């Protein structure tokens, strides 16, 4: 029986880590947002600000994580990340004031999630794959979609049956009990295994080795990163506020949380399908197609008046953002792959997570000011169209 290429074990580990990290910290947030607004009597802008603070921290720390991976290794960074993330969730059970929410969620939890999140996992997969890289990235990022299906429903069920404090404690347990052993045992580099990545060995390929300074001087880096930032900005407006938007229309809270799960479920074929397309055609056009689906989704959201329409929106934007997730690191790796990829991907993360900082607070501010989400959702369409234009202007990688 042929031995399984170890890179696929790394893909599996990345899948599980992203399931835990993205599902608990990001996709369960809209469920907690509604509860915090009701029980704490906080404004939606106040609660959404925690996600903005977290996005800023993740963007800033992402560059440091990429540098640390290059300096001290992948596994130490990821183990520390899992433990810190679990601590952040455990502390969230004790909050009584907004500043505590910002400290525990926005700072501590976000630092930990960055350690086991996309910078680390995408860097790990990139180390093992050259040919078929987008497919491998797509499979790994399916974990984000599955986590987005499971964790909001789990959080909603725990809150309904017990309370939000219990839900936060369970999130902490998941990150520590699952994230720590996977990070310590599975997430190894080719150097640690003393092997040459299979695809590079078979084809005699050698990825480029651009430094972060060289990458920052390239127009392609900024066009790709800013395009992703705009896409995530628009996406975060809808995702953060869609549960509250639905509840305002009279939709049951658990059913509204299910729409978040549906979004993530439809992101799975988006990740797999667009990931595969990224290996056989120009990734720029694949990324543009994914963003176009997001724009159409916002048109549907503006017309939504019932649960069925909300589900159609969730399906469309799920496929779109699912397609973006593996294509972004794949496109960056085509331009800047090599030993410094972690730092370069972290630097790109600093740019594109600006969108995740702005979107939640912008959506909350629009609602608190106008008592409607209409202008926020219209902005999502316009911003996504700008993202499509920028990626169209990005140059083609020299390797293609």
Task: Identify what each model region corresponds to.
Residues 9-35, 40-44, 65, 238-243:
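Extracytoplasmic
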Residues 19, 100-115, 229, 309-322:
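Hydrophobic core of transmembrane alpha-helices in multi-pass small-molecule transporters
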Residues 25-33, 216-272:
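Extracytoplasmic gate region of multi-pass secondary transporters
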Residues 61-73, 271-282:
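Helix-to-loop junctions at the C-terminal end of transmembrane segments
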Residues 83-96, 293-305:
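C-terminal ends and interior cores of transmembrane alpha-helices
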Residues 106-142, 337:
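Cytoplasmic helix-loop-helix junction between adjacent transmembrane helices
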Residues 140, 144-191:
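Helix-loop-helix hairpin linking two adjacent transmembrane segments in secondary transporters
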Residues 235, 255, 261-267, 273, ...:
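C-terminal transmembrane helical hairpin of 12-TM major facilitator-type secondary transporters
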């Amino acid at each position: 029986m042929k031995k399984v290429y170890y890179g696929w074990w790394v893909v599996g580990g990345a899948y599980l880590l992203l399931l835990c990290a993205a599902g608990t910290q990001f996709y369960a947030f809209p469920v907690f947002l509604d509860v915090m607004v009701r029980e704490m009597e906080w404004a939606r802008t106040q609660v959404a600000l925690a996600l903005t603070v977290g996005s800023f921290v993740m963007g800033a720390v992402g560059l440091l994580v990429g540098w640390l991976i290059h300096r001290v290794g992948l596994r130490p960074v990821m183990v520390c990340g899992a433990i810190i993330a679990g601590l952040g969730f455990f502390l969230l059970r004790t909050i009584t004031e907004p500043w505590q929410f910002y400290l525990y969620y926005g700072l501590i939890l976000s630092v930990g999630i960055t350690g086991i999140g996309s910078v680390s996992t995408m860097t790990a997969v990139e180390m093992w794959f050259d040919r078929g890289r987008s497919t491998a990235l797509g499979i790994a990022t399916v974990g984000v979609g599955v986590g987005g299906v499971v964790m909001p429903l789990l959080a909603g069920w725990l809150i309904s049956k017990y309370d939000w404090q219990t839900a936060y404690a369970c999130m902490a347990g998941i990150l520590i009990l699952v994230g720590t052993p996977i990070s310590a045992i599975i997430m190894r580099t080719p150097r640690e295994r003393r092997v040459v990545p299979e695809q590079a060995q078979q084809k005699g390929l050698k990825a480029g080795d651009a430094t972060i300074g060289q990458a920052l001087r390239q127009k392609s880096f900024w066009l790709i990163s800013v395009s992703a930032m705009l896409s995530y900005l628009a996406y975060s407006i809808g995702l953060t506020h869609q549960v509250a938007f639905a509840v305002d229309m009279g939709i049951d809270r658990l059913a509204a949380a299910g729409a978040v799960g549906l979004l993530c479920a439809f992101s799975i074929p988006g990740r797999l399908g667009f990931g595969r397309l990224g290996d056989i055609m120009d990734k720029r056009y694949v990324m543009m197609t994914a963003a176009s689906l997001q724009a159409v989704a916002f048109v549907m959201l503006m017309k939504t008046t019932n649960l069925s329409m909300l589900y159609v929106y969730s399906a469309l934007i799920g496929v779109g953002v699912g397609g973006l997730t593996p294509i972004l690191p794949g496109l960056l790796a085509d331009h800047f792959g090599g030993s410094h990829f972690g730092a370069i991907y972290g630097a790109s993360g600093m740019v594109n997570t600006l969108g995740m900082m702005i979107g939640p607070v912008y959506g909350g501010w629009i609602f608190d000011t106008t008592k409607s989400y209409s202008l926020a959702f219209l902005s999502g369409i316009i911003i996504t169209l700008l993202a499509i234009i920028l990626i169209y202007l990005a140059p083609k990688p020299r390797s293609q």
